[in-house]
Amino acid sequence: MIFIDSIVKIIKGFSALCGGSFFFYVGVLHFTDTSWFEPIVPPVFGSARFWVLISGVAEILVGLALIITGLEIFFSSTNYFGRKAGLASALLLVMLYPANLYMWIYDIELGDGASLSPTGHIFRLLLQIGGIMISLWIADFRYTFTDSNG
């Protein structure tokens, strides 16, 4: 059992480091290639550039938090930071999905003129759901159903 726990810890730490690196990289892209992201911001939100920059800041911060979490998992016996980082990552993925949904429903092209096929959008949705699940796993999230009557 100790061997399996060690393997799970390594996978969780690696997942946090990879997820954090991805978020950090994409967050930086929000500043270096703003026009690529702007078309997928739903008009109802107002200034696309504002939301691209704000989401870039959020992705960089969540990325750093997940990288720290990965290091914490590898070098500490606690997952204190990971609980917060994992929940923040899951929440960010949920909050960013309206842009992906808008892109899918209205067949919006990205800043470089590329667009996803219907299969690509489904794959992206599944990746987003998987990312949320991995984020909650990193956070050691547990939801227990309780009977409120007794």
Predicted regions and their residues:
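Membrane-interface extramembranous regions
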Residues: 2-150
